[in-house]
Amino acid sequence: MKKACFVLVLIVMLGMLCGCGEYVKSYAATILITSGHGDEASMKFDTFTGSYNFKLKRDGNPEHTLDLDASLRKGEMNVYIGVGGEKELLLTVKGGESYDETITLAKEYDNEKTIYIILESVGKCVDGDFEFEYN
């Protein structure tokens, strides 16, 4: 009986470990503020190194767009869109640049109700502000 309970606990733990999201967060940051609710997400930081992702779900009629506001004082940040474990580069934000634009997504994302936005730094980034809305 003890062995059966032990095996059951191991199976449940294995299932929990394997049930993680498709993308992994791995980062070091100071003064990191993130928010992700439904079709909107944001991230602000003083310093950031690594990778962070947001899961966005589209509500209502699809417009096939992603609204993006981004700024970075120093460093370089790659912004990807992810679906099904794959990712595609949307744009690269470099130190001193800022963006306020609406990106029309490729047709392959037309039927996707859920996407991931993945932010990956190239080295250390300083004073970043990123906001997204999936339409």
Task: Label the model's feature ranges.
Residues 21-57:
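Transition segment at domain starts
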Residues 74-91, 133-134:
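Short, surface-exposed beta-strand/strand-loop-strand elements in extracellular ectodomains
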